[in-house]
Amino acid sequence: MEMGNQHPSISRLQEIQKEVKSIEQQVLGFSGLSDDKNYKKLERILTKQLFEIDSVDTEGKGDIQQARKRAAQETERLLKELEQNANHPHRLEIQNIFQEAQALVKEKVVPFYNGGNCVTDEFEEGIQDVILRLTHVKTGGKVSLRKARYHTLTKICAVQEIIENCMKKQPSLPLSEDAHPSVAKINSVMCEVNKTRGTLIALLMGVNNKETCRHLSCVLSGLMADLDALDVCGHTEIRNYRKEVVEDINQLLRYLDLEEEADTTHAFDLGQNHSILKIEKVLKRMREIKTELLQAQNPPELYLSAKTELQGLIGQLDEVSLEKNPCIREARRRAVIEVQTLITYIDLKEALEKRKLLACEEHPSHKAVWDVLGNLSEIQGEVLSFDGNRTDKNYIRLEELLTKQLLALDAVDPQGEEKCKAARKQAVKLAQNILSYLDLKSDEWEY
Protein backbone atom coordinates (compact mmCIF):
# COMPACT_ATOMS: atom_id res chain seq x y z
CA MET A 1 0.00 0.00 0.00
CA GLU A 2 1.47 3.35 -0.98
CA MET A 3 1.99 6.06 1.64
CA GLY A 4 -0.59 8.34 0.00
CA ASN A 5 -3.30 5.69 0.25
CA GLN A 6 -2.30 4.37 3.69
CA HIS A 7 -5.09 3.87 6.21
CA PRO A 8 -5.16 6.71 8.81
CA SER A 9 -4.97 4.17 11.67
CA ILE A 10 -1.77 2.66 10.24
CA SER A 11 -0.29 6.16 9.82
CA ARG A 12 -1.17 6.99 13.44
CA LEU A 13 0.45 3.78 14.71
CA GLN A 14 3.61 4.58 12.75
CA GLU A 15 3.73 8.06 14.33
CA ILE A 16 3.42 6.56 17.82
CA GLN A 17 6.12 3.96 17.06
CA LYS A 18 8.42 6.74 15.87
CA GLU A 19 7.90 8.59 19.18
CA VAL A 20 8.58 5.39 21.13
CA LYS A 21 11.72 4.74 19.07
CA SER A 22 13.00 8.25 19.82
CA ILE A 23 13.35 7.44 23.54
CA GLU A 24 14.56 3.84 23.16
CA GLN A 25 18.24 4.72 23.78
CA GLN A 26 17.28 6.68 26.92
CA VAL A 27 15.45 3.61 28.23
CA LEU A 28 18.25 1.16 27.37
CA GLY A 29 20.85 3.45 28.96
CA PHE A 30 18.78 4.36 32.03
CA SER A 31 21.06 3.77 35.01
CA GLY A 32 19.00 5.15 37.88
CA LEU A 33 16.40 3.73 40.26
CA SER A 34 12.62 3.58 40.14
CA ASP A 35 12.24 6.68 42.35
CA ASP A 36 14.32 8.87 39.99
CA LYS A 37 12.58 11.73 38.18
CA ASN A 38 13.83 10.47 34.82
CA TYR A 39 12.40 7.00 35.49
CA LYS A 40 8.97 8.46 36.18
CA LYS A 41 9.22 10.66 33.08
CA LEU A 42 10.12 7.75 30.77
CA GLU A 43 7.49 5.52 32.38
CA ARG A 44 4.86 8.23 31.89
CA ILE A 45 5.76 8.71 28.21
CA LEU A 46 5.64 4.97 27.45
CA THR A 47 2.39 4.42 29.38
CA LYS A 48 0.82 7.32 27.49
CA GLN A 49 1.93 5.76 24.18
CA LEU A 50 0.31 2.47 25.21
CA PHE A 51 -2.99 4.27 25.80
CA GLU A 52 -2.60 6.01 22.43
CA ILE A 53 -1.98 2.67 20.72
CA ASP A 54 -4.97 1.11 22.48
CA SER A 55 -7.22 3.95 21.31
CA VAL A 56 -6.40 3.41 17.61
CA ASP A 57 -9.51 2.09 15.84
CA THR A 58 -8.74 -1.12 13.92
CA GLU A 59 -12.22 -1.23 12.28
CA GLY A 60 -11.95 -5.01 12.61
CA LYS A 61 -9.25 -5.15 9.92
CA GLY A 62 -6.59 -7.83 10.39
CA ASP A 63 -3.64 -5.79 9.10
CA ILE A 64 -4.42 -2.88 11.45
CA GLN A 65 -4.92 -5.26 14.38
CA GLN A 66 -1.52 -6.83 13.70
CA ALA A 67 0.14 -3.40 13.40
CA ARG A 68 -1.44 -2.30 16.69
CA LYS A 69 -0.33 -5.50 18.40
CA ARG A 70 3.28 -5.02 17.20
CA ALA A 71 3.33 -1.39 18.36
CA ALA A 72 1.97 -2.37 21.79
CA GLN A 73 4.52 -5.20 22.16
CA GLU A 74 7.42 -2.88 21.32
CA THR A 75 6.25 -0.28 23.87
CA GLU A 76 5.68 -2.95 26.54
CA ARG A 77 9.18 -4.31 25.85
CA LEU A 78 10.69 -0.89 26.60
CA LEU A 79 8.58 -0.50 29.74
CA LYS A 80 9.82 -3.89 30.93
CA GLU A 81 13.43 -2.96 30.07
CA LEU A 82 13.09 0.28 32.05
CA GLU A 83 11.74 -1.58 35.07
CA GLN A 84 14.45 -4.26 34.85
CA ASN A 85 17.21 -1.63 34.61
CA ALA A 86 15.98 0.11 37.76
CA ASN A 87 15.45 -3.11 39.73
CA HIS A 88 18.30 -5.27 38.47
CA PRO A 89 19.91 -7.09 41.45
CA HIS A 90 23.34 -5.68 40.55
CA ARG A 91 21.89 -2.15 40.26
CA LEU A 92 20.48 -2.54 43.76
CA GLU A 93 23.87 -3.88 44.90
CA ILE A 94 25.52 -0.70 43.55
CA GLN A 95 22.98 1.41 45.43
CA ASN A 96 23.51 -0.50 48.69
CA ILE A 97 27.28 0.01 48.47
CA PHE A 98 26.74 3.71 47.65
CA GLN A 99 24.52 4.06 50.73
CA GLU A 100 27.39 2.70 52.85
CA ALA A 101 29.61 5.41 51.38
CA GLN A 102 26.91 8.01 52.14
CA ALA A 103 26.82 6.88 55.77
CA LEU A 104 30.61 7.16 55.99
CA VAL A 105 30.56 10.69 54.56
CA LYS A 106 27.73 11.74 56.86
CA GLU A 107 29.48 10.38 59.94
CA LYS A 108 33.15 11.15 59.24
CA VAL A 109 33.43 13.94 56.64
CA VAL A 110 30.54 16.40 57.05
CA PRO A 111 31.41 17.00 60.75
CA PHE A 112 35.04 17.67 59.72
CA TYR A 113 34.00 20.54 57.44
CA ASN A 114 31.71 21.83 60.15
CA GLY A 115 34.69 22.33 62.46
CA GLY A 116 35.22 18.77 63.76
CA ASN A 117 38.44 16.79 64.03
CA CYS A 118 40.42 15.55 61.04
CA VAL A 119 39.21 12.83 58.67
CA THR A 120 40.15 9.46 60.19
CA ASP A 121 42.04 6.45 58.84
CA GLU A 122 38.83 4.51 59.43
CA PHE A 123 37.10 6.67 56.81
CA GLU A 124 39.92 6.20 54.29
CA GLU A 125 39.87 2.42 54.78
CA GLY A 126 36.07 2.37 54.52
CA ILE A 127 36.08 4.33 51.25
CA GLN A 128 38.81 2.09 49.79
CA ASP A 129 36.69 -0.96 50.64
CA VAL A 130 33.62 0.61 49.00
CA ILE A 131 35.59 1.42 45.83
CA LEU A 132 37.02 -2.10 45.63
CA ARG A 133 33.59 -3.70 46.05
CA LEU A 134 32.10 -1.44 43.38
CA THR A 135 34.80 -2.44 40.88
CA HIS A 136 33.79 -6.07 41.49
CA VAL A 137 30.09 -5.56 40.74
CA LYS A 138 29.32 -7.58 37.62
CA THR A 139 27.67 -5.69 34.76
CA GLY A 140 27.52 -8.46 32.14
CA GLY A 141 28.28 -5.78 29.56
CA LYS A 142 24.85 -4.18 30.21
CA VAL A 143 25.05 -0.45 29.41
CA SER A 144 22.74 0.64 32.24
CA LEU A 145 24.81 -1.24 34.85
CA ARG A 146 28.11 -0.03 33.44
CA LYS A 147 26.85 3.55 33.61
CA ALA A 148 25.54 3.13 37.15
CA ARG A 149 28.80 1.60 38.36
CA TYR A 150 30.91 4.23 36.57
CA HIS A 151 28.87 7.21 37.84
CA THR A 152 28.86 5.89 41.41
CA LEU A 153 32.61 5.23 41.34
CA THR A 154 33.27 8.64 39.79
CA LYS A 155 31.45 10.43 42.62
CA ILE A 156 33.07 8.42 45.40
CA CYS A 157 36.55 8.77 43.87
CA ALA A 158 35.97 12.53 43.50
CA VAL A 159 35.14 12.77 47.22
CA GLN A 160 38.24 10.74 48.06
CA GLU A 161 40.34 13.03 45.85
CA ILE A 162 38.88 16.25 47.30
CA ILE A 163 39.74 15.08 50.82
CA GLU A 164 43.22 13.83 49.85
CA ASN A 165 44.06 17.11 48.07
CA CYS A 166 42.81 19.08 51.04
CA MET A 167 44.92 17.05 53.50
CA LYS A 168 48.05 17.02 51.30
CA LYS A 169 48.12 20.58 50.06
CA GLN A 170 46.64 23.10 52.42
CA PRO A 171 46.83 26.56 50.81
CA SER A 172 49.34 28.97 52.33
CA LEU A 173 48.32 30.00 55.78
CA PRO A 174 46.37 33.26 55.73
CA LEU A 175 48.80 36.12 55.27
CA SER A 176 48.84 38.98 57.70
CA GLU A 177 46.12 41.43 56.76
CA ASP A 178 48.61 44.23 57.40
CA ALA A 179 50.58 43.16 54.32
CA HIS A 180 48.02 44.52 51.84
CA PRO A 181 44.36 45.61 51.83
CA SER A 182 43.47 42.67 49.50
CA VAL A 183 44.68 40.01 51.94
CA ALA A 184 41.60 40.31 54.17
CA LYS A 185 39.35 39.56 51.18
CA ILE A 186 41.48 36.60 50.02
CA ASN A 187 41.44 35.18 53.56
CA SER A 188 37.67 35.56 53.67
CA VAL A 189 37.26 33.84 50.27
CA MET A 190 39.56 31.00 51.36
CA CYS A 191 37.34 30.35 54.40
CA GLU A 192 34.27 30.28 52.14
CA VAL A 193 36.01 27.86 49.75
CA ASN A 194 36.75 25.49 52.65
CA LYS A 195 33.09 25.55 53.71
CA THR A 196 32.01 25.01 50.10
CA ARG A 197 34.31 21.99 49.85
CA GLY A 198 32.28 20.26 52.56
CA THR A 199 29.03 21.28 50.87
CA LEU A 200 30.27 19.88 47.54
CA ILE A 201 31.15 16.53 49.12
CA ALA A 202 27.71 16.33 50.73
CA LEU A 203 26.09 17.26 47.40
CA LEU A 204 28.05 14.70 45.35
CA MET A 205 27.12 12.00 47.85
CA GLY A 206 23.46 13.00 48.01
CA VAL A 207 23.49 13.78 51.74
CA ASN A 208 22.56 17.46 51.29
CA ASN A 209 19.10 17.97 49.78
CA LYS A 210 19.11 21.73 50.38
CA GLU A 211 21.89 22.48 47.88
CA THR A 212 22.01 22.20 44.08
CA CYS A 213 24.92 21.99 41.64
CA ARG A 214 23.72 25.14 39.89
CA HIS A 215 23.58 27.21 43.08
CA LEU A 216 26.97 25.98 44.30
CA SER A 217 28.45 26.75 40.89
CA CYS A 218 27.09 30.31 41.16
CA VAL A 219 28.58 30.67 44.67
CA LEU A 220 32.02 29.51 43.48
CA SER A 221 31.87 31.69 40.36
CA GLY A 222 30.99 34.65 42.59
CA LEU A 223 34.02 33.97 44.80
CA MET A 224 36.17 33.76 41.68
CA ALA A 225 34.84 37.14 40.51
CA ASP A 226 35.65 38.64 43.92
CA LEU A 227 39.26 37.45 43.61
CA ASP A 228 39.57 38.63 40.00
CA ALA A 229 38.48 42.12 41.06
CA LEU A 230 41.36 42.50 43.52
CA ASP A 231 44.31 44.67 42.51
CA VAL A 232 47.47 42.84 43.58
CA CYS A 233 49.89 44.20 40.96
CA GLY A 234 53.49 44.33 42.13
CA HIS A 235 52.88 41.99 45.08
CA THR A 236 54.18 38.57 44.03
CA GLU A 237 53.53 36.84 47.37
CA ILE A 238 49.91 38.05 47.49
CA ARG A 239 49.37 37.24 43.80
CA ASN A 240 50.62 33.67 44.39
CA TYR A 241 48.36 33.36 47.42
CA ARG A 242 45.36 34.46 45.34
CA LYS A 243 46.40 32.04 42.56
CA GLU A 244 46.31 29.09 45.00
CA VAL A 245 42.78 29.95 46.09
CA VAL A 246 41.69 30.43 42.44
CA GLU A 247 43.11 26.98 41.58
CA ASP A 248 41.14 25.48 44.46
CA ILE A 249 37.93 27.06 43.17
CA ASN A 250 38.57 25.83 39.61
CA GLN A 251 39.13 22.30 40.91
CA LEU A 252 35.83 22.35 42.81
CA LEU A 253 34.02 23.65 39.72
CA ARG A 254 35.43 20.70 37.74
CA TYR A 255 33.99 18.29 40.29
CA LEU A 256 30.63 20.01 39.96
CA ASP A 257 30.63 19.15 36.26
CA LEU A 258 30.58 15.44 37.15
CA GLU A 259 26.81 15.31 37.52
CA GLU A 260 26.25 16.89 34.12
CA GLU A 261 28.92 14.75 32.44
CA ALA A 262 27.31 11.62 33.88
CA ASP A 263 24.55 11.74 31.28
CA THR A 264 26.66 12.79 28.30
CA THR A 265 29.97 10.97 28.68
CA HIS A 266 30.77 7.56 27.25
CA ALA A 267 33.68 7.14 29.65
CA PHE A 268 31.79 4.25 31.28
CA ASP A 269 32.40 2.27 28.09
CA LEU A 270 35.88 1.12 29.04
CA GLY A 271 36.04 -1.19 26.02
CA GLN A 272 37.27 1.82 24.02
CA ASN A 273 39.52 3.21 26.77
CA HIS A 274 43.18 3.65 25.73
CA SER A 275 44.55 2.01 28.90
CA ILE A 276 42.16 -0.94 28.63
CA LEU A 277 43.12 -1.43 24.98
CA LYS A 278 46.80 -1.63 26.05
CA ILE A 279 45.91 -4.18 28.74
CA GLU A 280 43.90 -6.21 26.21
CA LYS A 281 46.84 -6.17 23.79
CA VAL A 282 49.12 -7.57 26.52
CA LEU A 283 46.55 -10.24 27.44
CA LYS A 284 46.14 -11.24 23.80
CA ARG A 285 49.88 -11.85 23.47
CA MET A 286 49.97 -13.65 26.84
CA ARG A 287 47.22 -16.03 25.65
CA GLU A 288 49.16 -16.73 22.45
CA ILE A 289 52.29 -17.60 24.48
CA LYS A 290 50.18 -19.77 26.82
CA THR A 291 48.68 -21.70 23.88
CA GLU A 292 52.14 -22.25 22.36
CA LEU A 293 53.44 -23.58 25.69
CA LEU A 294 50.50 -25.88 26.43
CA GLN A 295 50.43 -27.32 22.90
CA ALA A 296 54.20 -27.57 22.24
CA GLN A 297 55.72 -30.98 21.47
CA ASN A 298 58.85 -30.02 23.42
CA PRO A 299 57.88 -27.20 25.86
CA PRO A 300 61.36 -26.80 27.50
CA GLU A 301 62.66 -25.32 24.24
CA LEU A 302 60.24 -22.42 24.69
CA TYR A 303 60.73 -21.74 28.42
CA LEU A 304 63.52 -19.15 28.20
CA SER A 305 62.09 -17.07 25.33
CA ALA A 306 58.55 -17.27 26.77
CA LYS A 307 59.68 -16.09 30.22
CA THR A 308 61.68 -13.23 28.74
CA GLU A 309 58.70 -12.03 26.72
CA LEU A 310 56.27 -12.44 29.63
CA GLN A 311 58.52 -10.34 31.87
CA GLY A 312 58.46 -7.70 29.13
CA LEU A 313 54.64 -7.83 29.21
CA ILE A 314 54.72 -7.18 32.98
CA GLY A 315 56.82 -4.09 32.18
CA GLN A 316 54.21 -2.93 29.65
CA LEU A 317 51.45 -3.34 32.25
CA ASP A 318 53.46 -1.26 34.74
CA GLU A 319 53.40 1.59 32.20
CA VAL A 320 49.60 1.55 31.77
CA SER A 321 47.97 4.79 32.92
CA LEU A 322 45.32 4.13 35.60
CA GLU A 323 43.60 7.50 34.92
CA LYS A 324 42.44 7.54 38.57
CA ASN A 325 39.94 4.87 37.54
CA PRO A 326 39.61 1.93 39.97
CA CYS A 327 38.16 -0.30 37.23
CA ILE A 328 41.31 0.20 35.12
CA ARG A 329 43.42 -0.45 38.22
CA GLU A 330 41.53 -3.71 38.81
CA ALA A 331 41.88 -4.69 35.13
CA ARG A 332 45.63 -4.12 35.32
CA ARG A 333 45.93 -6.02 38.61
CA ARG A 334 44.17 -9.03 37.11
CA ALA A 335 46.28 -8.87 33.94
CA VAL A 336 49.48 -8.85 36.04
CA ILE A 337 48.23 -11.95 37.91
CA GLU A 338 47.47 -13.66 34.56
CA VAL A 339 50.99 -13.03 33.24
CA GLN A 340 52.69 -13.77 36.57
CA THR A 341 50.83 -17.09 36.88
CA LEU A 342 52.16 -18.19 33.50
CA ILE A 343 55.71 -17.24 34.56
CA THR A 344 55.25 -19.27 37.78
CA TYR A 345 54.02 -22.23 35.69
CA ILE A 346 57.21 -22.10 33.59
CA ASP A 347 59.39 -21.74 36.72
CA LEU A 348 57.86 -24.88 38.24
CA LYS A 349 58.20 -26.83 34.98
CA GLU A 350 61.88 -25.83 34.79
CA ALA A 351 62.47 -26.84 38.41
CA LEU A 352 60.85 -30.24 37.79
CA GLU A 353 62.96 -30.76 34.64
CA LYS A 354 66.18 -29.96 36.55
CA ARG A 355 65.21 -32.35 39.34
CA LYS A 356 64.92 -35.21 36.85
CA LEU A 357 68.61 -34.73 36.01
CA LEU A 358 69.67 -35.01 39.67
CA ALA A 359 70.05 -38.63 40.73
CA CYS A 360 70.90 -38.01 44.36
CA GLU A 361 69.22 -39.45 47.45
CA GLU A 362 66.83 -37.18 49.33
CA HIS A 363 64.79 -37.15 52.51
CA PRO A 364 61.44 -39.01 52.08
CA SER A 365 59.50 -35.94 53.25
CA HIS A 366 61.30 -33.77 50.72
CA LYS A 367 60.47 -36.29 47.98
CA ALA A 368 56.80 -36.23 49.08
CA VAL A 369 56.74 -32.43 48.63
CA TRP A 370 58.26 -32.74 45.15
CA ASP A 371 55.65 -35.36 44.23
CA VAL A 372 52.92 -32.88 45.19
CA LEU A 373 54.67 -30.14 43.19
CA GLY A 374 54.61 -32.46 40.17
CA ASN A 375 50.86 -32.92 40.63
CA LEU A 376 50.37 -29.17 41.09
CA SER A 377 52.21 -28.52 37.83
CA GLU A 378 49.78 -30.78 35.94
CA ILE A 379 46.75 -29.23 37.65
CA GLN A 380 48.06 -25.71 36.98
CA GLY A 381 48.27 -26.54 33.27
CA GLU A 382 44.56 -27.46 33.38
CA VAL A 383 43.70 -24.33 35.36
CA LEU A 384 45.50 -22.18 32.76
CA SER A 385 43.30 -23.77 30.06
CA PHE A 386 40.08 -23.48 32.10
CA ASP A 387 37.57 -21.04 30.63
CA GLY A 388 34.31 -21.57 32.50
CA ASN A 389 32.47 -20.41 35.60
CA ARG A 390 32.05 -21.74 39.12
CA THR A 391 29.04 -23.89 38.26
CA ASP A 392 31.04 -25.97 35.75
CA LYS A 393 31.83 -29.56 36.72
CA ASN A 394 35.42 -28.96 35.65
CA TYR A 395 35.74 -26.05 38.10
CA ILE A 396 34.54 -28.25 40.97
CA ARG A 397 36.90 -31.05 39.89
CA LEU A 398 39.93 -28.71 39.75
CA GLU A 399 39.03 -27.19 43.11
CA GLU A 400 38.83 -30.69 44.65
CA LEU A 401 42.17 -31.70 43.11
CA LEU A 402 43.88 -28.62 44.54
CA THR A 403 42.31 -29.19 47.96
CA LYS A 404 43.63 -32.79 47.91
CA GLN A 405 47.15 -31.50 47.21
CA LEU A 406 46.88 -29.11 50.15
CA LEU A 407 45.79 -32.02 52.36
CA ALA A 408 48.69 -34.11 51.05
CA LEU A 409 51.12 -31.31 51.96
CA ASP A 410 49.52 -31.03 55.39
CA ALA A 411 50.21 -34.73 55.91
CA VAL A 412 53.94 -34.37 55.12
CA ASP A 413 56.06 -34.61 58.28
CA PRO A 414 59.32 -32.63 57.76
CA GLN A 415 60.83 -34.46 60.77
CA GLY A 416 62.79 -31.34 61.69
CA GLU A 417 64.30 -30.93 58.21
CA GLU A 418 64.51 -27.14 57.64
CA LYS A 419 64.89 -27.58 53.88
CA CYS A 420 61.76 -29.72 53.79
CA LYS A 421 59.82 -27.23 55.95
CA ALA A 422 60.69 -24.40 53.55
CA ALA A 423 59.79 -26.52 50.49
CA ARG A 424 56.44 -27.52 52.00
CA LYS A 425 55.64 -23.90 52.90
CA GLN A 426 56.44 -22.83 49.32
CA ALA A 427 54.32 -25.65 47.88
CA VAL A 428 51.35 -24.70 50.10
CA LYS A 429 51.63 -21.08 48.92
CA LEU A 430 51.73 -22.24 45.29
CA ALA A 431 48.62 -24.42 45.72
CA GLN A 432 46.76 -21.53 47.38
CA ASN A 433 47.82 -19.17 44.57
CA ILE A 434 46.54 -21.63 41.94
CA LEU A 435 43.22 -21.84 43.83
CA SER A 436 43.00 -18.03 43.94
CA TYR A 437 43.81 -17.85 40.23
CA LEU A 438 41.07 -20.40 39.47
CA ASP A 439 38.64 -18.18 41.41
CA LEU A 440 39.82 -15.09 39.54
CA LYS A 441 39.39 -16.81 36.16
CA SER A 442 35.87 -17.95 36.99
CA ASP A 443 34.33 -14.90 38.71
CA GLU A 444 33.00 -13.48 35.41
CA TRP A 445 34.38 -10.00 36.13
CA GLU A 446 34.35 -7.48 33.27
CA TYR A 447 35.05 -3.80 32.76
Swiss-Prot record:
Question: Which positions fall inside the BAG domain?
Answer: 9-86, 95-167, 182-260, 275-350, 365-442
The record's GO CC annotations read: cytoplasm; cytosol; inclusion body; junctional membrane complex; membrane; mitochondrion; nucleus; perinuclear region of cytoplasm
Q: Does the keyword Lyase apply?
A: no
Looking at the record's lineage, which domain of life comes first? Answer: Eukaryota
Keyword list, A-Z: Chaperone, Repeat
Any Pfam family matching the protein: BAG
Any one GO MF term held by the record is: adenyl-nucleotide exchange factor activity
Domain commentary: The fifth BAG domain is responsible for the interaction with HSP70 nucleotide-binding domain.
> Could you tell me which PANTHER family the record lists for this protein?
BAG FAMILY MOLECULAR CHAPERONE REGULATOR 5, BCL2-ASSOCIATED ATHANOGENE
* Function (record text): Co-chaperone for HSP/HSP70 proteins. It functions as a nucleotide-exchange factor promoting the release of ADP from HSP70, thereby activating Hsp70-mediated protein refolding. Has an essential role in maintaining proteostasis at junctional membrane complexes (JMC), where it may function as a scaffold between the HSPA8 chaperone and JMC proteins enabling correct, HSPA8-dependent JMC protein folding. Inhibits both auto-ubiquitination of PRKN and ubiquitination of target proteins by PRKN.
> Quaternary arrangement and interactors, per the entry?
Binds to the ATPase domain of HSP/HSP70 chaperones. Binds PRKN. Interacts complex with HSPA8 and JPH2.
Recorded protein name is BAG family molecular chaperone regulator 5
Q: Which organism is it from?
A: Bos taurus
Source organism phylogeny: Eukaryota, Metazoa, Chordata, Craniata, Vertebrata
